A protein has these predicted regions:
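N-terminal pre-catalytic segment of deacetylase/amide-hydrolase enzymes
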Residues: 6, 15-50, 55-69, 85-88, ...
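Intrinsically disordered, low-complexity proline-rich regions
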Residues: 1-5, 10-12, 17-18, 126
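Alpha-helical membrane-targeting segments
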Residues: 17-37, 111-112, 116, 141-147, ...
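Acidic-and-aromatic substrate-binding clefts and catalytic sites of carbohydrate-active enzymes
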Residues: 54-58, 77-86, 108-116, 135-142, ...
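A short, conserved beta-to-alpha structural element at the edge of catalytic cores
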Residues: 69-96
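His/Asp/Glu-enriched short active-site or ligand-binding loop at hydrolase and phosphoryl-transfer sites
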Residues: 140, 145-179, 215-222
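CE4/NodB-like, metal-dependent polysaccharide N-deacetylase domain
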Residues: 64-73, 98-99, 105-108, 115-143, ...
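A cross-domain feature marking catalytic cores of carbohydrate-active enzymes
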Residues: 51-53, 78-80, 102-104, 136-138, ...
Length: 222
């Protein structure tokens, strides 16, 4: 009989895998961060579109054009250093009535940084963003970081991540995720990034059109 090796999977690794690779976060993950917003009113026929990682000139202006075409407002969780590089795109997002959220200054994952490093990076971003909303990149937060964020911000996670960033996904796959998992109160995550934009050129207008056909209203966080 061959020796069977056992492997220990750290809790943090399990959390990373769960937060990155499923479209709808598990109940236990939502329970772990109860003060975070995962889903809005389940009795309201509304969804909340969110976009992470911008602003960048290759993606954000196109997304804004699509949103304007459909008369939809969204929330953009921005990387502070991208706002520093492209302040005119940030200003366009604001001028067109969209909501801004903090996505750290350098898109850092919480598990790789101390609370001091993490909080500094968040505050550095907020010097550009001036917002009370925050979304941790990849959903990664140590419990100490979660506690700190909860005192200073409204933490916005997601009810549906479209996985538009994945090289294994097509535009049709992204649209299919929206059709399969969107529901009342869903916070839906797309990305204004180089990894996602080619898929979004097809998937974003198709997703918005389908959601409108299903009777959903589009809201931003108050």
């Amino acid at each position: 009989m061959r020796n069977v090796k056992s492997f220990h999977i750290p809790h943090s690794s399990l959390l990373i895998q769960t937060s990155m690779f499923i479209e709808q976060p598990a109940k236990w993950l939502r329970w772990l961060y109860p003060k975070a917003l995962w889903r809005m009113d389940p009795n309201d026929r509304s969804v909340y579109l969110t976009f992470d990682d911008g602003p960048i000139p290759e993606a954000t202006p196109y997304i804004l054009d699509v949103l304007a075409q459909y008369g939809v407002k969204a929330t953009f969780f921005m990387v502070g250093d991208n706002v520093r590089k492209y302040p005119e795109i940030y200003q366009r997002v604001v001028n067109e009535g969209h909501r801004i959220g903090n996505h750290t200054h350098n898109h850092i994952g919480g598990f790789r940084h101390t609370i001091k490093e993490y909080s500094y990076n968040i505050e550095k971003a907020n010097a550009y963003l001036h917002t009370d909303l925050v979304r941790p990149p990849h959903g990664w937060m140590r419990l100490s970081q979660y506690a700190w964020l909860s005192r200073k911000f409204r933490i916005v996670m997601w009810d549906l991540v479209t996985r538009d960033y994945s090289k294994w996904m097509t535009a049709d796959d992204v649209l299919d995720n929206v059709k399969r998992f969107a529901r009342n109160g869903s916070i839906i995550t797309f990305h204004d990034s180089l990894k996602s934009i080619e898929k979004l050129r097809t998937a974003l207008p198709a997703s918005i059109g389908w959601l409108q056909q299903q009777g959903y209203q589009f809201k931003v966080f108050e």
